[in-house]
């Protein structure tokens, strides 16, 4: 069943890539709500299902009624939970656990990404940067590993969307990266909240150095710095301070030796991290070689 829904989501994502029809987009949004309800009904997360259904269908109605370009863009941002419009996310994730939470943070957002790319307006660029700062400030007041991971994932998704705006080719790369990575990680999540103190989850969702999320930030900032400004320097400072919030998690993972938390998959640990690094090196080396070839062509 899970494999079928994964293939179905990939199909919906490809469909949104190749169409700009509002009714088709709305139909995909509706189908994603149905997929989430079908996946959640066996987990007993009825509060999260109800909150998600009400929020998504209300915003879907607004998406059809308010047929204004920029307003539709903000509505889709709110539907996905892009910061700073992520205020409703905790009302859903509070009752989600295990792989279902991973699905909500990754696969559930994928079909919305092509719509955001097509509706993007440059005037909304700084809203994404403001949302990233909101996530960094919010990390200082959160309690619990689960909430920190949700906010970290939300912040990472903002960077992913910004990367897609700067290069459409990155959309395809990141799409396949998330699909392959979640195929490795999702089947191995355990019972309730203990699984969120694993090294595998830490690597993927906390943007550790030399992971894909880390490189995404570096390349986005290299493009954004062309705009120049003190706000971007402030954003870099907040990125550093946010890592201090994760230090408690890192210390706990290093010193705890409890049986119920000692379920890290060491083989997966040594497989996922090299894949992340090698995929980034290969992808961006190809881009660099293409740019060098173009430069040589123009010099000739």
Swiss-Prot record:
It catalyses: a ubiquinone + NADH + 5 H(+)(in) = a ubiquinol + NAD(+) + 4 H(+)(out). It is found in: Mitochondrion inner membrane. It comes from Ascaris suum. Core subunit of the mitochondrial membrane respiratory chain NADH dehydrogenase (Complex I) that is believed to belong to the minimal assembly required for catalysis. Complex I functions in the transfer of electrons from NADH to the respiratory chain. The immediate electron acceptor for the enzyme is believed to be ubiquinone. The keyword rRNA-binding does not apply. Belongs to the complex I subunit 2 family. Keywords: Electron transport, Membrane, Mitochondrion, Mitochondrion inner membrane, NAD, Respiratory chain, Translocase, Transmembrane, Transmembrane helix, Transport, Ubiquinone. Its EC number is 7.1.1.2. GO terms for cellular component: mitochondrial inner membrane. Its main location: mitochondrion. GO terms for molecular function: NADH dehydrogenase (ubiquinone) activity. The lineage of its organism: Eukaryota, Metazoa, Ecdysozoa, Nematoda, Chromadorea. This is NADH-ubiquinone oxidoreductase chain 2. It is a multi-pass membrane protein. The chain crosses the membrane at residues 4-24, 29-49, 58-78, 87-107, 122-142, 165-185, 201-221, 231-251, 267-287.
């Amino acid at each position: 069943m899970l494999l079928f829904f994964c293939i179905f989501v990939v199909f919906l994502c490809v469909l949104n890539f190749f169409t700009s029809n509002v009714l088709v987009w709305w139909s995909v949004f509706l189908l994603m709500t149905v997929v989430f309800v079908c996946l959640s009904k066996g987990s007993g997360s009825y509060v999260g299902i109800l909150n998600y259904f009400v929020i998504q269908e209300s915003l879907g109605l607004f998406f059809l009624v308010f047929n204004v370009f920029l307003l539709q863009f903000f509505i889709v941002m709110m539907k996905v939970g892009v910061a700073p419009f992520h205020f409703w996310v905790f009302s859903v994730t509070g009752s989600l656990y295990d792989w279902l939470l991973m699905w909500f943070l990754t696969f559930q957002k994928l079909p919305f990404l092509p719509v955001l790319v097509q509706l993007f307006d440059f005037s909304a660029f700084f809203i994404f940067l403001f949302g990233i700062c909101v996530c960094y400030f919010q990390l200082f007041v959160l309690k619990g590993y689960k909430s920190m991971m949700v906010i970290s994932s939300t912040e990472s998704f903002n960077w992913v969307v910004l990367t897609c705006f700067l290069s459409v080719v990155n959309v395809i790369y990141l799409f396949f990266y998330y699909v392959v990575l979640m195929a490795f990680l999702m089947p191995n999540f355990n019972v309730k909240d203990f699984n969120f103190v694993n090294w595998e989850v830490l690597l993927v969702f906390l943007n550790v150095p030399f992971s894909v999320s880390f490189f995404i930030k570096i390349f986005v900032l290299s493009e954004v710095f062309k705009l120049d400004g003190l706000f971007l320097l402030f954003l870099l400072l907040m990125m550093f301070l946010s890592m201090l919030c994760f230090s408690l998690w890192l210390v706990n993972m290093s010193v705890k030796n409890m049986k119920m938390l000692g379920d890290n998959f060491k083989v997966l640990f040594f497989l996922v991290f090299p894949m992340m690094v090698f995929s980034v090196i290969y992808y961006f080396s190809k881009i660099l070689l293409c740019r060098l070839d173009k430069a040589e062509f123009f010099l000739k």
